[in-house]
């Protein structure tokens, strides 16, 4: 599969000049663009999938990861800007949902849709005791306690975990330091996606994303925990395709904060 991109921050595994829309996928903390690789054929040819690629992982492994969520979002928005010549949506998972939200606020064009997966809304993220500063063994124990979707084979591979450690630590630091700032509501519909048994994004917190958009906001739940999306991918792909290839409903009354 050939990757074409004008920026290291956005991978375009399959460029589709005739696509009706684009989907920008933002991975979870510590994750790379390959976590969304199976979405590329799943949405073609109607939707071109663009993968957000943060430094410090996969082919950018030798680059220093960033520990500032707003700075990350600014880089993502800058890389997206040349690709907004047709309807587009963002889909972020876990910390990626917060990055996607912050990037959407900076874009020169409004998204057609935002999909927020496995994340409480940014204004209601509960502060947890910080762990990013802990010694390696303690930090990784906390990561393993939090994440239910990383295979044992990965945890048990000391060399692989050593490669992943800097980006994991930077992402946890970015999330721990992030504080939401009141902003204009997103001018587009938002679909919130969650796992019914996700302890990191409790079901009761998800509907509060509605306060961050002037459009319609709906919440959809799936069986599973924090990485429910691995099994629910086909259903969510259908939702994305429908949202990007059918006319959007009229905006609802503004529900913004601030």
What kind of region is each of these model predictions?
Residues 1-91, 95-258:
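Domain-scale detector for complete catalytic domains at protein termini or as standalone homologs
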